[in-house]
């Protein structure tokens, strides 16, 4: 897996992260936005773009991968495209 240290990377919209803490530990998310000490994420399934999850930077790990799907699709299609991108990423990681 392509894990990096969050302290060396500034998370931005479209980055893939994996949850390190909480009931969603091990889940893959896409970054929608960042706040002062928090990252706003969604997975398109349990946490949709309209019910975003707020996680501390220290509770996620950057996967060194990025998607432009957030900016390229209309807002009503974000969740379906996020699910598709996460599914594709999981398939790639399973092959490694």
Q: PLM features: residue spans?
A:
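Ferredoxin-like alpha/beta domains used as RNA- or RNAP-binding modules
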Residues: 1-13, 20-21, 30-96
């Amino acid at each position: 897996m392509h894990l990096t240290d969050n302290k060396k990377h500034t998370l931005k919209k479209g980055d893939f992260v994996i949850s390190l803490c909480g009931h969603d530990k091990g889940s893959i998310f896409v970054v929608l936005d960042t706040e002062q000490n928090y990252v706003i994420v969604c997975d398109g399934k349990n946490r949709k773009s309209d019910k975003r999850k707020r996680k501390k930077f220290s509770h996620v790990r950057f996967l060194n991968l990025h998607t432009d799907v957030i900016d390229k699709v209309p807002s009503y299609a974000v969740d379906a495209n996020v699910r598709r991108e996460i599914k594709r990423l999981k398939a790639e990681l399973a092959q490694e």
